[in-house]
Amino acid sequence: MFKNKKIMIVVAHPDDEILGLGATMHRLINSYNVNTHLLILGEGITSRSDNRDLKKWNSELKIHKQNIMESKKLIGYHSISVNKLPDNRFDSLALLDLIKLIEKEKKKFKPDMVF
């Protein structure tokens, strides 16, 4: 069922790719030779303050980016797209814009399945 398939993983925040699917994806990559593309929608940190200020959280966002690259190596994800949608504020976005973002990645990667 999974052998040599293309799987796109869509997560809301950095670290969801580890907590939610990390072990499963690691197994599928190593045992079934799946090709993976990880799509992270949100930046994962600015909701810790009242106002969304990317400059204020710049050093933490850099650490997040390093952690994402480390998870790519550990799990074995083949490619990653990281977006900077507002953390825990997806409801402030037009649903169509969110769908278009996911569909654009899906069209580019052409997965057999999406998690």
Regions found by a protein language model. Give the residues of each.
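Active-site rim/loop-helix segments in enzyme catalytic domains that contact anionic ligands
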Residues: 1-109
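Short N-terminal targeting/anchoring amphipathic segment
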Residues: 109-115
